[in-house]
């Protein structure tokens, strides 16, 4: 069902049995396949592809020409940059070992989950089987081959953790005001990773290898 308040461009290809939530915008030449669910107040940019069975939460932005394949779950507030690709097959082949054309039953979907508030940069590739944590960020062009902890900043090919980011998107700094380095061992006893933009403060959680917010934004700062 497409909510009456949703805006769907005339050139978009929306297959049957698709759910589109209130206030969502779907732009030029987007293809959304059968069984996909798109939540409320989302923006799906031109030439994006949403495969069958994909689940997209609320307030998600998927930019132009992004490809989101079967088996992907996108939680609320996620950003997927232009040209990003979210795959679903760790061992892709066009044919079977006997040389026959591979059919649907010859392969298994390996899911991807993008957690609340996470961001995937322009042209990044997320490999099947990966989970990207809450408010984590993959830089432009990254090839993400393993799961990313909450608030981690990863970049490169294959992607490696290079730092940590705030819920507002800014890179966190240490007590000296320098960009917080990636090495988690340096945070085992530290409670003062701060955001220079909004003032939130985070602590490293060794067991989870991720960050936990300890105090909210300062008064009058961007939320």
Where on the chain are the PLM-derived regions?
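Structural signal for interior beta-strand "rungs" in well-ordered beta-sheet cores
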Residues: 2-97, 102-155, 159-161
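Short cysteine-rich clusters marking metal-coordination/redox-active sites
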Residues: 166, 195-198
């Amino acid at each position: 069902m497409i909510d009456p308040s949703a805006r769907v461009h005339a050139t978009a290809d929306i297959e049957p049995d698709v759910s589109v939530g209130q206030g969502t915008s779907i732009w030029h030449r987007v293809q959304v396949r059968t069984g996909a669910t798109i939540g409320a107040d989302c923006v799906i940019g031109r030439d994006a592809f949403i495969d069958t069975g994909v689940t997209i939460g609320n307030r998600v932005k998927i930019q132009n020409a992004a490809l989101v394949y079967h088996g992907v779950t996108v939680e609320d507030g996620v950003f997927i940059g232009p040209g990003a690709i979210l795959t679903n097959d760790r061992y892709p082949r066009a044919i079977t070992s006997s040389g026959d054309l591979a059919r649907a039953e010859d392969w298994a979907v390996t899911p991807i989950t993008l957690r609340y508030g996470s961001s995937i940069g322009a042209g990044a590739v997320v490999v099947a089987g990966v989970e990207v944590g809450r408010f984590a960020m993959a830089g432009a062009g990254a090839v993400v081959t393993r799961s990313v902890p909450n608030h981690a900043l990863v970049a490169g090919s294959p992607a490696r953790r290079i730092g940590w980011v705030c819920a507002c998107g800014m890179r966190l700094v240490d007590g000296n005001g320098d960009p917080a380095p990636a090495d988690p061992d340096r945070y085992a006893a530290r409670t003062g990773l701060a955001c220079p933009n909004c003032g939130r403060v985070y602590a490293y959680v060794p067991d989870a290898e991720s960050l936990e917010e300890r105090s909210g934004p300062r008064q009058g700062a961007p939320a």
